[in-house]
A protein has these predicted regions:
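GHKL-type ATPase core
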Residues: 2-112
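GHKL/Histidine-kinase-like ATPase module
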Residues: 72, 87, 107-214
């Protein structure tokens, strides 16, 4: 987690206070010259992580670090990589809603809208493949497929399996689409399955999970 933080941040500060403790501690580092831990102040229990985002480098092709301050970018990253973490990840999200109509509004009144912020849960928390097959309907399989892969058609086949061994256990949910991807016969096609560990996306296209002859 700290390594990923320093990919976009020039300085990381962690303020933590254990439940039942009167003392908080502050961990700080710039990612280059070690770190410091000192007593600090925190009114409530828990942990706050504060990132100082790097300034954008010059150049047209340079990375833009301030995009990680944008709501849609952060929420998209959470849904992509941490959608199945087993605790809620919440964020203040903007929503547009109509203002109350005035009592003396004219007949041709056009509604006015305002932006409000609500604390939304971004992740679904429970992956479908960890549930027992007997508790899942085909409609639920199909709905998950459509939402996950942005395909309006139902899959041609759904394969859901669970395996336990001495050294490893896994759940697998495979979908065979009704039609081949548009880029299937092009050089740009990337094969592979999505690989998750403890609910976190490790690889989006892991080619080694499924051999070509399958």
């Amino acid at each position: 987690g700290f390594y990923a933080s320093f990919m976009v941040a020039s300085h990381v500060k962690v303020v933590s206070k254990a439940c039942g403790s009167d003392q908080a501690y502050v961990w700080e580092s710039d990612g280059a010259d070690g770190f410091t831990i000192e007593p600090g102040e925190k009114e409530t229990y828990g942990t706050d992580i504060i990132l100082t985002i790097k300034p954008n480098p010059e150049g047209e092709d340079a990375e833009s670090y301030d995009e990680f301050l944008q709501t849609y970018r952060l929420s998209g990253l959470v849904r992509k990589y941490s959608d199945y973490i087993r605790y809620p990840i919440k964020m203040l999200m903007p929503h547009s809603q109509a203002k109350p109509k005035p009592e003396d509004a004219p007949e041709d009144y056009q509604p006015e809208y305002e932006t409000i912020y609500t604390e939304d849960t971004l992740n679904s928390m429970v992956p479908l493949w960890t549930k027992d097959k007997k508790d899942i309907t085909q409609d639920e399989y199909d709905e998950f497929y459509r939402n996950k892969f942005m395909d309006y058609m139902k899959p041609a086949r759904t394969i859901h399996s669970h395996s336990e061994g001495l050294t490893a256990s896994y759940d697998a949910l495979l979908y065979i689409p009704s039609q081949a991807p548009y880029d299937y016969y092009s050089k740009d096609f990337a094969k592979g399955l999505s690989l998750y560990t403890s609910g976190v996306l490790i690889m989006d296209k892991c080619a080694d999970l499924l051999p070509d002859y399958f």
